[in-house]
Design a protein with these regions (language model features):
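Hydrolase active-site cap/lid region
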Residues: 216-265, 322-325, 331-338
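Short beta-strand element of the alpha/beta-hydrolase
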Residues: 79-81, 90-100
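Surface beta-strand/loop "capping" patches
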Residues: 342-381, 397-416
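Short amphipathic alpha-helix adjacent to the substrate-entry channel of hydrolases
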Residues: 107-127
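Cap/lid segment of the alpha/beta-hydrolase catalytic domain
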Residues: 101-102, 123-182, 234-250, 254
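N-terminal cap/lid segment of alpha/beta-hydrolase-fold proteins
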Residues: 33-88, 115, 128, 168-175
């Protein structure tokens, strides 16, 4: 899908000012990743042979994070599982960025999905675990065993409270998370070399925090030729989270880890802006012209369902979007990964994805499709009769679909009319034959009507940091 044009006004609340006491440096991420760490090493702990593939299980130490005076375990280790089809034809590989816990001591076994993708595409497919390495216990911290956002938010707090200085940048866990994925690609290439299979390039996919890390990995490593960030619908954090507050009038419980560490009190400060400048993918989007397939849920607990509006028209290159109707943050019970497989296969085989373009104007979505494409169209809509909130745990799985008959001119639109009370959300979904066992499934962005907010902008009760006027 080519560059999209949007006629609806976007909320522009981008903070550009940085601290006067420090010069901006957007290279912290790359500098950190490519600083050699003598702790890096790996070993192949198990090789299994099946009828149509081999499975390599590897333990990798990606490096160290912080010091023993700051955290109980400085060395990050990860399981890497690599599926190598007997009939490997491609020099590209798919790397899925996974989570997990260091308490799991056994090697990570390849999932049925991993094996299926490898055999379907005749390519190497791998997964890396423990992104981030967790749980961790920090010195002088009253809380034990921090995981996931709890771990990341604690590091954010330390960085912000220290004045967002260069010397404290290592507190940002996104740096070692990104380094781990880059080192994982190194290891996969080395394993490939040992079995005489050249791996030149990678497609990276990951969900939630791993979706954010998918973006940052592409920022620092040219081996990444396409990305699939999943359920990380927050690019351009500042206006996106102002939007979040104005829709809900509160912070969603899903981001309690950040609220509990006081991170939201830093919003609107030079220190907070500095943090985003270092680790937020939106800071680097002008460097990312590679194909991107963004997969989100319409009912995500973390992000408002029309958050695409704050970044989509700024993305460069070929970009594709899928809002999974009735999908929560885990896409539980709603998501079929077939479109991801089709996208990955198209990338590694240089197959063109049929062109379509969409845009939003006032209260309607417009979609134009290449007349040569073999496709079907659906509309999806949902109503909240009370407020502007489409999270699954608020409205349930209430999105309903309607088939749309194919038109003579391959042009479509969806009018999202204002309901009698509350708000209505809608989107268009297009399913396109990919020439494989799995079709492409893409959507437009979600449109909500009426275009109004039930709440005022967020103002911290106890603002922290140097405020931006």
């Amino acid at each position: 899908m080519k560059k999209l044009i949007f006629s609806t006004p976007l909320i522009l609340l981008i903070i550009l000012t940085i601290s006067n006491c420090e010069k901006s440096n957007n290279n912290h991420l790359k500098d950190y990743v490519y600083t050699k760490d003598p702790a890096f090493r790996y070993e192949i702990v198990q090789i299994d042979t099946a009828k149509s593939w081999k499975e390599y299980r590897i333990k990798m130490i990606s490096g160290t994070w912080l010091t023993k005076n700051e955290v109980n375990n400085t060395e990050w280790w990860h399981w890497i599982t690599i599926v190598v089809p007997n009939k490997t034809l491609e020099t590209e590989a798919l790397l899925i960025v996974g989570g997990g816990s260091s308490k799991k001591k056994e090697p990570l076994n390849a999932s049925e999905l991993l094996i299926n993708i490898a055999l379907e595409t005749n390519s190497i497919v791998a997964e890396i675990s423990n992104i981030p390495f967790q749980p961790l216990n920090f010195s002088n911290d009253s809380k034990d065993d921090r995981y996931e956002d709890d771990l990341i938010a604690y590091g954010w707090k330390k960085f912000l409270e220290g004045g967002a200085k260069d010397k404290d940048v290592e507190w940002l866990a996104r740096l070692p998370m990104t380094r781990a994925v880059v080192r994982g690609m190194d290891v996969i290439q080395k394993v490939g070399d040992n079995i005489n299979i050249k791996i030149n390039e990678f497609v990276i996919a990951g969900a939630s925090k791993r979706g954010w890390t998918t973006w940052t990995t592409a920022v620092v490593d040219d081996r990444v030729i396409a990305i699939v960030p999943i359920v990380i619908d927050l690019l351009n954090v500042v206006p996106s989270f102002d939007h979040h507050w104005r829709c809900y009038g509160e912070w969603s419980p899903a981001i309690d880890d950040y609220v509990n560490e006081g991170i939201t009190d830093w919003m609107g400060s030079k220190e907070y802006n500095r943090l985003l400048q270092i680790v937020e993918p939106y800071s680097f989007i002008d460097q990312l012209s590679i194909p991107k397939f963004l997969i989100n849920g319409t009912g995500d607990e973390f992000f408002v369902t029309d958050s695409w509006q704050f970044y989509w028209n700024k993305l460069i290159g070929e970009n594709f979007l899928q809002y999974v109707p009735n999908g929560n943050h885990g896409l539980t019970g709603s998501y079929n990964p077939g479109s991801l497989i089709a996208f990955y296969n198209a990338i590694i085989t240089n197959r063109n994805i049929p062109e379509f373009n969409w845009y939003v104007s006032n209260d309607s979505i417009y979609l134009d499709v290449d007349s040569n494409a073999d496709y079907t169209i659906k509309s999806w809509q949902a109503i909240n009769e009370n407020t502007r909130d489409f999270r699954v745990d608020v409205i349930g799985k209430s999105w309903k679909s309607d088939e749309i008959y194919k038109t003579v001119n391959d042009k479509y639109y969806l009018h999202v009319s204002k309901p009698t009370s509350g708000y209505k959300a809608g989107l268009l979904e297009i399913t396109i034959d990919s020439g494989t066992n799995y079709p492409f499934v893409f959507t437009t962005g979600t449109l909500i009507s009426p275009n109004s907010y039930p709440f005022m902008p967020f103002e911290p009760l106890t603002p922290k940091g140097k405020r931006i006027k």
